[in-house]
A protein has these predicted regions:
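Hydrophobic alpha-helical segments in the ANL/AMP-binding
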Residues: 1-3, 24
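Non-catalytic C-terminal accessory region of glycerolipid acyltransferases
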Residues: 4-7, 41-165
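Membrane-interfacial amphipathic helices and adjacent loop/beta segments
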Residues: 10-41
């Protein structure tokens, strides 16, 4: 995108066990202006430093990475294991949250920057995480064909609840 060509970004990715697939994943992510890519498995210390150094941080917080560092927050009316990193990073750094909406088009991508969220972080990590999920849900409802439905968003369940997959 034009943004990543003009402004170096920091982003997080999940390192893959298969070295060939991992190399392909990294090559795809590194094609825009050599962003700083941080492996999720390394933790968030480097992300905190990058934010404090003034780098924009491109963060995709709606993946189910399991129970670690997650809470259950509603997503389409279903409790979804949701990482709390967005709220925690905003609290630790004072970073403003600027939602980015990306649409695939026949010619590439359209990227829309929304106004920064007001009052975020709010009164609690739980409220912030529910707010984030509600925002994502609203955007998915507007263009469901754009969402990454192949990701098993509800694979981690509250204790005692049956897995849907």
């Amino acid at each position: 995108t034009m943004m990543t060509m003009a402004v170096p970004l920091v982003s997080v990715y999940s390192s893959q066990k298969n070295p060939v697939f991992n190399a392909v994943l990294l090559a795809g992510r590194l094609r825009f202006n050599a962003p700083i890519l941080l492996s999720r498995q390394e933790g968030m210390r480097r992300a905190l430093k990058a934010l404090k150094d003034g780098y924009p941080f491109y963060y995709l917080p709606d993946m189910d990475f399991g129970a670690r560092d997650a809470i259950f927050a509603p997503f389409f009316g279903v409790p979804a294991a949701t990482i709390t990193g967005l709220s925690r990073l905003a609290r630790a750094t004072g970073a403003r949250i600027v939602p980015v909406i990306t649409r695939m088009t026949a010619d590439g991508y359209e990227v829309e920057l929304r106004p920064p969220w007001q009052g975020y972080p709010g009164e609690s990590v739980e409220a912030d995480t529910a707010r984030m999920n509600a925002f994502i849900e609203d955007e998915v409802r507007k263009m469901p064909e754009q969402y990454y439905w192949v990701h098993r968003r509800f694979k981690t369940r509250p204790q005692g609840e049956k897995k849907p997959y």
